[in-house]
């Protein structure tokens, strides 16, 4: 007796790769700093409008394509781990900048000045810089807490930009898009190129200890 041929049943399994890419694009659009998105869409858009657009799940993949480039082959993109392990890039910059100016941190001793400095950079960045005093870069001391905070932020962002410059474009942009437009991360100086690797090895090690 001849048995009937088995009937091939076509299943509609979800494309896991596509879903993963879609989720990653949505996360990228939602985490992008509003100034970055406004610059691509319309600089006249209000911050509230931009935030509403970012929250729209239907628009998020398209916004990510706009931010990263419409000509990218999204099926071939490999979404690896975030370079900062998901941490705020501004905080990463402040940690690096605090090491850069650790010698100046030691000179801020009055309770009033210390409070003003910590208010600007955070207690964790202040402690982190002093803890890594041996890796300090700047020799010129800054005694004014406001000026010191500004310089910590500037040099920290510049180090972040230099560190990112040697990373693949997608991973680099995923971090830069979380920063507002106009930070020193966009134009690091040669001095930051030389120091960024060592400083950010300490920053990343710190992040890994926080979130093992």
From Swiss-Prot:
Keywords: Nodulation, Plasmid. This is Nodulation protein NolU. It comes from Sinorhizobium fredii (strain NBRC 101917 / NGR234). The lineage of its organism: Bacteria, Pseudomonadati, Pseudomonadota, Alphaproteobacteria, Hyphomicrobiales.
């Amino acid at each position: 007796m001849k048995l009937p041929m088995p009937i091939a049943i076509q299943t509609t399994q979800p494309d896991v790769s596509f879903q993963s890419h879609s989720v990653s694009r949505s996360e990228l659009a939602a985490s992008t700093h509003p100034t970055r998105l406004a610059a691509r869409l319309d600089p006249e858009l209000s911050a509230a409008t931009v935030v509403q657009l970012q929250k729209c799940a239907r628009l998020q993949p398209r916004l990510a394509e706009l931010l990263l480039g419409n000509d990218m082959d999204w099926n071939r993109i490999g979404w690896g781990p975030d370079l900062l392990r998901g941490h705020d890039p501004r905080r990463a910059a402040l940690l690096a900048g605090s090491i850069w100016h650790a010698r100046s941190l030691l000179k801020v001793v009055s309770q009033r000045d210390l409070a003003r400095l910590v208010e600007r950079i955070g207690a964790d960045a202040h402690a982190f810089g002093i803890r890594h005093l041996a890796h300090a870069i700047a020799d010129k001391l800054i005694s004014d807490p406001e000026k010191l905070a500004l310089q910590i932020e500037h040099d920290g962002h510049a180090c972040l930009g230099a560190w990112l410059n040697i990373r693949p474009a997608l991973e680099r942009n995923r971090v830069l898009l979380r920063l507002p437009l106009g930070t020193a991360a966009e134009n690091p100086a040669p001095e930051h190129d030389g120091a960024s690797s060592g400083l950010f090895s300490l920053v990343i090690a710190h992040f890994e200890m926080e979130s093992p």
